[in-house]
Amino acid sequence: MVKFMYNKVLRFKHWYESRFSKILPLWAFLPLVGCFVLNAFVYWITQLLMAGAYHYDFTLPIDRKVPVIPGWISIYILSYAFWAINYIVIARQNRRTCYRLVFADYFSKIVCGVIFIIIPTTNVRPEVIGSSVWEFLLKFIYLMDSPTNLFPSIHCLVSWLCAIGLRGTRVSTWYKVFSYAFAIAVCISTQLTKQHYIVDVFGGIALAEISLLIGEHFVKRKNFT
């Protein structure tokens, strides 16, 4: 049985390296898969655990003045592709950059999980009136994504990691600028779609910065190159 599994692993290794190693090295593949798995686990498990708990609403007066603009749901949805692309771009640079990002991602998601349990949050979504494609997509997101686990915003957290994870890399300056611009656009989209409120945004950005800083110390101690 052990030999059988070993042969399967070797076959996968050869198959992956012959097809995808130029896009993403094998040593970066599993850690990035781990980011996806941990994100899903933290988000959905905490929702189940806290389903019957009291949820806090951190709505501020400024939040009530922000209008709903359904078209911004396009940025909100495109953020998923942005995450995948930038995580690959960052991870393929070298082991140090890869593991700095991965450690920051893992650490921040664990912190999110703890906060989601200690301080479960929610908000009151507006009624979406209209039948345009943007309103349809906004209604769909509202249907699929319950208004819980809001603080800190994982959307803002991961988008900001996608931008700051490029620090110190040889990635072209224009792409770094684009990544910051898109990350900011994602943060704005969370406000204009009422998926999050302002404290969620700043919480996500702050956690991203702290997590990457800790990730930098981690890779220095482990002496990754």
Q: Each PLM stretch: what is its role?
A:
Residues 2-83, 138:
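N-terminal transmembrane-helix/juxtamembrane module of multi-pass inner/ER membrane proteins
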Residues 37, 75-82, 154-158, 202-206:
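Membrane-embedded alpha-helical segments of multi-pass membrane proteins
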Residues 40-41, 109-115, 181-192:
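Aromatic-anchored segments of alpha-helical transmembrane domains
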Residues 46-61, 91-174, 222-224:
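Membrane-interface loops
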Residues 82-86, 157-164, 181-189:
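Hydrophobic, membrane-inserted alpha-helices
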Residues 147-151, 185-212:
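Interfacial helix-loop-helix junctions of multi-pass membrane proteins
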Residues 163-167, 208-216:
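Hydrophobic transmembrane alpha-helices
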